[in-house]
Curated annotation (Swiss-Prot):
This is Protein PB1-F2. It comes from Influenza A virus (strain A/Memphis/4/1980 H3N2). The record marks N66 as: Low pathogenicity. Oligomer. Interacts with human SLC25A6/ANT3 and VDAC1. Interacts with host MAVS. Plays an important role in promoting lung pathology in both primary viral infection and secondary bacterial infection. Promotes alteration of mitochondrial morphology, dissipation of mitochondrial membrane potential, and cell death. Alternatively, inhibits the production of interferon in the infected cell at the level of host mitochondrial antiviral signaling MAVS. Its level of expression differs greatly depending on which cell type is infected, in a manner that is independent of the levels of expression of other viral proteins. Monocytic cells are more affected than epithelial cells.
Amino acid sequence: MEQEQDTPWTQSTEHINIQKKGSGQQTQKLGRPNLTRLMDHYLRIMSQVDMHKQTVSWKLWLSLRNPTQGSLRTRALKQWKSFNKQGWTN
């Protein structure tokens, strides 16, 4: 059986306190997630998303500044499709 990898998300949301009863049985009690860890994880993910957005917009800016024949064709096709969707209404 494959063991699940411990990620910051699972670490913070699945705190399990195991308590032994007198009979030797184990009970599991879910604890409260550590808010600091949740916030750190959230901020880390959002930072990665922002970096991706910046990279995409930078690549777009570069492609507009130094367009290749392929990028010009793609851009023209996108504009043509959006124009056709709007129709001939003025």
